[in-house]
Design a protein with these regions (language model features):
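PLP-dependent class I/II
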Residues: 1-54, 58-424
């Protein structure tokens, strides 16, 4: 999408991959020191070696320190950190560990609707029971415990719900859950004995005024031993999102909290089957959780680049909401975080009937027409799940500002034309 890579991350990666560059005076000293520290933690001082299945020990230690800083000093144990091939790998691994049983005793997993399709796909592959709970679109996609209770009680008629998945900030919905909401969810999980999976890969992507990222772990521990000693939690982060956007490195981690020792041994066996996560991805993760510090040569440039990326995304989030809400028949909630908007669109009844006659969801029909006539590619809301009778699409806010502005105006014009064409 034209985003310039973060210089520090690419410089350290370059040296790690080609250590001869340690002798090149073009690289700042802190870059060389960081690369050398990572290489010395690798087998044979090379990124080409296997690592321990749980990940390089030094990187896991740095991840723990990062979590402690993020969460205001709440302790994190490197032994509870599992490095992974992006967050997706550890999410699927955790689901494999948790899913069991047959028939009515089959594990049910509560997932938000709309959801990131990784979850529904993984549950289908594992033969788990998908239990949908709906986010509240009228309240900016907030999570409502009453809705969780409804979903859980309905599910208990045909499966054994054991797991609650949360995506915060949201994908595809771009919301940031409030601290109160997280506290309510933790109480609910404790009361119902649910394992919580907190997908927090967009934790750096917060744009809306008044919104803040609260990690599930931090809130859990601040609620005191009644909850922090009881609720089982796995939280996930990735190198693919945030300000870095280094998807191809496939770096990520999972932290587990309150996991029984015997179960944790089984988790370690499970991750050992895939040998180890990509070592270059582990190295990149280390640079992200242990970035340049004030006074170091790379600090000013690193912070300037990071703030520029996040500031630009915040401006595009505001722009997307503003332009789409200026179109009759499109309703776009504020993009509080993450990288997407998920606007609701009106589709005339004639277009709905035509789509159904062609075996298509109405929003897929709309998205295909949009692609054919404008070249703009968005994803139909039916691919993520939505309430019956509503239609949405997901679009990213990643294109450069001027291109995004033009794209949004063309999309707005197309929707108006579409409404006219298919209205009575």
């Amino acid at each position: 999408m034209g985003q310039k890579p973060i210089t520090f991350l690419r410089q350290v990666s370059a040296i790690c991959l080609y250590p001869e560059l340690l002798n090149d005076n073009k690289f700042p000293d802190d870059v060389k020191q960081k690369a050398l520290r990572i290489l010395q933690a690798c087998g044979g001082n090379s990124l080409g070696s296997y690592s321990a299945s749980q990940g390089i020990e030094v990187v896991r230690q740095d991840v723990s320190r990062y979590i402690e800083r993020r969460d205001g000093g709440i302790p994190s144990n490197p032994d509870n950190i599992y490095l992974s091939t992006g967050a997706s790998d550890s999410i699927v691994t955790m689901l494999k560990l948790l899913v069991s049983g047959q028939g009515r005793s089959r594990t049910g997993v509560l997932i938000p609707i709309p959801q990131y399709p990784l979850y529904s796909a993984a549950l289908a592959e594992l033969g788990a029971v998908q239990v949908n709970y709906y986010l509240d679109e009228e309240k900016c996609w907030a999570l409502n415990v009453t809705e969780l209770q409804r979903a859980l009680h309905e599910a208990r008629k045909h499966c054994d719900p054991k797991v609650l998945c949360i995506i915060n900030p949201g994908n595809p919905t771009g919301q940031v859950q409030s601290r109160k909401c997280i506290e309510d969810v933790i109480r609910f999980a404790a009361e119902e004995n649910l394992f919580v999976m907190a997908d927090e890969v967009y934790q750096d992507n917060i744009y809306a005024e008044g919104c803040a990222f609260h990690s599930f772990k931090k809130v859990l521990f601040e609620m005191g031993p009644k909850y922090s000693d009881v609720v089982e939690l796995a939280s996930f982060h990735s190198t693919s999102k945030g300000f870095m956007g280094e998807c191809g490195f496939r770096g990520g981690y999972m932290e587990v909290v309150n996991m029984d020792c015997a179960v944790k041994q089984e988790l370690t066996k499970l991750v050992s089957v895939r040998l180890c996560p990509p070592v270059p991805g582990q190295a990149l993760l280390d640079m992200i959780v242990n970035p340049p510090q004030p006074g170091e040569p790379s600090y000013k440039q690193f912070m300037a680049e990071k703030q520029a990326v996040l500031g630009n995304l915040a401006e595009k989030a505001r722009l997307t909401e503003e332009i789409l809400n200026g179109a009759p028949g499109i309703q776009c909630n504020p993009v509080q975080g993450a990288m997407y908007s998920f606007p609701r669109i009106q589709i005339p009844e004639r277009a709905v009937r035509l789509a159904q006659s062609e075996g298509q969801a109405p929003d897929m029909f709309f998205c295909m027409k949009l692609l054919e006539e404008t070249g703009i590619c968005v994803v139909p809301g039916s691919g993520f799940g939505q309430r019956d009778g509503t239609h949405h699409f997901r679009m990213t806010i990643l294109p450069p500002t001027e291109k995004l502005k033009s794209l949004l105006e063309r999309l707005k014009d197309f929707h108006q034309k579409f409404m006219q064409e298919y209205s009575p």
